Amino acid sequence: MTGKLHQLGPQTKIFLVIKAKKTLTPEFIKQQIGRAFRDLLGSLAVPSLAMPASVRGALGGADNQSAVASAMVHFGVTEADLKKVMAAALEKGGDYADLYFEHTFNNNVVLMDGKVNNCGANIDFGMGVRVLAGDQTGYAYVEGVTMEEMLRAARTAARIASSGKAGKSVGLTEKTIAKSRYAVTEPWEDVSVKAKIPYLEKLNEKIFSLDNRVRKVQASLSDSTSHVLFCNSEGVSYYDYRPMVSFMAVCIMEENGKMENGYAGRSYRKGFEFMTDDIVDIIAREAVDKTAILFKAVKPKGGEMPVVMGAGGSGILLHEAIGHAFEADFNRKRTSIFCDLLGKKVCDEHINVVDDGTIAFNRGAVNFDDEGVEGQKTYIVKEGILTSYLHDRISAKHYGVAPTGNGRRDTFRNTPIPRMRATYMEAGNMKEADIISTVKKGIYCDQFTNGQVQIGAGDFTFFVKSGYLIEDGKLTQPVKDINIIGNGPKALADITMVANNDKIDNGTWTCGKDGQSCPVTCGMPSALVSKLTVGGES
């Protein structure tokens, strides 16, 4: 039956959503619908939606000088148009204005019970205008790029942030980097659904082949491509091509009438070249291993005890419980517990915490943030000292420092705010086994799932899917379904040992804040927190 798994089942859901009003002609809409269904039937994707080859050629860094000009052609605007809209944005006295154009394609294919039962496509198109005047921010967006629509958005934003004296913009200068951090060789725009399905089939078959206890598998593949054109009243302009792929599986197993489930996935800023038999094998084995261990696991007794955070995925605790409190908007508003601690010691001197937008192909990587600032590596904590918050343009101006490249937004419908990218703790100088050997009785955390954090106080609760008991310095009984309860700043201060096995978790992490979602990653080496409350059996 494997030869027929690619066929659409009777319950298959097919979605095509085109979010771009007025500027899309009936002929354009018809073209997109035709493309979507030709994809589903297996033909090659029509390249008309792709960015021109002149821009794609620039993505590798060899020649990026024509990228903005080609992007203007793609969006149907000229430099004169941009200057006219910018002038309208500043006509009420704004200190600063920027224009953000976005054209995004999202695709998703899900295979369940050996059949494709969900196949969706989404096209998003529009632009937003932001105006800053003192402490005021005006923002408006339109789902189209006619001059009438852009001027309406610009004047709406200008009225919101008005100081009464017209501002001035300058000529545009293209901003480039030497080499894209996520140049692709096989763009998703050129890949049909038919070409993707075999990898879902292979993942499904591989998981079933690894363990006869497997009862159900859900395999899914999501890809997206965003074309972003940005310019501001300071003369900065750039074009960014942003690919993304997420490949994942949920595995359900049964043993003696008992059911368990596990998940594994990978996500990168890569094109179709990411899809290989090796990545299928990695995800399949991880999904099975994470599920199988749960049959042996027990719920431990609760209480306060030492906790060893495993390398990689434990970085979610660093991101959620501590990382958000380092974002500058929370500190500017004095809602973060770290608002008065800049330049002060917040943890042991062997700890360095970084937020990095420069890791090649990383889910959280940025060539430029959504305010025109080039991606960079920012030390939040250096040798135990809080050295920097994560800044957007507004917070950087407040603190009198340069932006850190953390001004990010969900879509053109949103204003940029300080957001993390790849947040991790750098390696220490100890071996993980040596750290574990110091613990008489405690918990080793392996898989984290969801959690809750109060940004102000820093209190958190995290659910640990699986881990191990530590008894007399050794990992013993697997454990599952436990809660870790603590306070972020205190937990950071209570880290007493850090291993040399630093690891970035390249899972499908997405961070939510103020109603916006952004792709991120996290990571850390194994580390000992001297005491946390573990919620288990009474």
Name each model feature, range by range.
Residues 3-538:
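N-terminal small-residue-enriched
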